[in-house]
């Protein structure tokens, strides 16, 4: 019977050791699982934050792009309207009544000592301008106004209606735009 007691003692010790090893293993498994869950939660949280940030950045880029496109379209409409205003202005200047056209041409010639200059005009204004100036240079392809040039051609002052309209328009484009579009 002593052998049975030894066997039972060994079995009891073995069961105790197995139970102890199982308990340690379960604790180790629980610790590893807990750490894995924590890391998974951290990774998930980080990835969600990255995804949220990426989505917000994408939305900002898309909004910025859409706003830029809208401003471009708006600018194109403004340019078209301003061009229509410029064309109407040129049309109005082209169709000035004869007396107003002649008065404007005289005003354009006032600052110059015409005996030392050649003056060019449109074909329409040829008779009037040639009667005003001692050195008529001929006609140019302009809608109206005059071009004054030194006799040697080194200095030229372009007072054609097209150039005056362009210069006035360029100088006043901000004001015109503000009046038209607020």
Swiss-Prot record:
Pfam families: vATP-synt_E. GO terms for biological process: proton motive force-driven plasma membrane ATP synthesis. It is found in: Cell membrane. One of its GO terms (cellular component) is proton-transporting two-sector ATPase complex, catalytic domain. Keywords: ATP synthesis, Cell membrane, Hydrogen ion transport, Ion transport, Membrane, Transport. It comes from the Archaea. SUPFAM superfamilies: V-type ATPase subunit E-like. Coiled coil: none annotated. It is a peripheral membrane protein. GO terms for molecular function: ATP binding; proton-transporting ATP synthase activity, rotational mechanism; proton-transporting ATPase activity, rotational mechanism. The keyword Cell membrane applies. Has multiple subunits with at least A(3), B(3), C, D, E, F, H, I and proteolipid K(x). Component of the A-type ATP synthase that produces ATP from ADP in the presence of a proton gradient across the membrane. HAMAP family: ATP_synth_E_arch. Belongs to the V-ATPase E subunit family. This is A-type ATP synthase subunit E. The lineage of its organism: Archaea, Methanobacteriati, Methanobacteriota, Stenosarchaea group, Methanomicrobia.
